[in-house]
Design a protein with these regions (language model features):
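DPxDG-like acidic metal-binding loop motif
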Residues: 1-3
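Histidine/acidic-residue-rich, glycine-tolerant segments that coordinate divalent metal ions
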Residues: 6-121, 126-130
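Metal-dependent amide/peptide-bond hydrolase catalytic core
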Residues: 97-169
Length: 169
């Protein structure tokens, strides 16, 4: 790869230090695990270049960009608990499926240029005529800025609190 080519380059002057981050899509993972090991101790680091696979580029093509490029990634997990039962008995139920659907809709509305929130997993159980007691949601939140990340997390908490108050779930 690139490291091998640079190491073999006779005109290259300097020290090249290659880092490979483990579990970059996991939490905790990626750079936080690497940096916890203090890999730069004893080195005078003048530049760090990050690389990530970009499926929109042709194989063998490198893309460069100054500044922020890859966002932070938070894994989100939610549980909506209600009182399930037979679908014909809706007035007696506290439907977590309906509440979860509204919650997902409100979460997705938080998306904008500096934030990407996705729900990639919804698990409920039940049957065609049975409303489950609980719905599980999982997704990711990606932001470029720590302050923006904190703001979105607070908005998520506010939405959850408001829905809890409105639905009794």
């Amino acid at each position: 790869g690139v490291l091998q080519q640079l190491a073999a380059e006779p005109n290259f002057r300097g020290t090249l230090f290659g880092l490979f981050q483990p579990g970059e899509e996991c939490n905790p993972g990626g750079a936080s695990l690497v940096l916890a090991e203090n890999p730069f101790d004893g080195y005078e680091v003048r530049a760090v270049v990050g690389e990530h696979v970009e499926p929109q580029l042709e194989v063998g093509t490198l893309g460069f960009r100054a500044g922020k490029y890859m966002a932070s990634s938070d894994e989100l997990r939610f549980s909506v608990r209600g009182t399930g039962g037979h679908g014909a008995m809706r007035p007696q139920l506290k439907d977590p499926v309906a509440a979860a659907a509204e919650f997902v809709t409100r979460l997705i509305a938080l998306n904008h240029e500096e934030c990407v929130l996705s729900i990639g997993r919804i698990e409920a159980g039940g049957a065609t005529n049975i409303v489950p007691d609980e719905v599980y949601l999982e997704g990711t939140l990606r932001t470029f800025d720590e302050r923006e990340r904190e703001i979105i997390h607070q908005r998520i908490r506010n939405i959850a609190a408001e829905m809890t108050q409105n639905t009794g779930l």
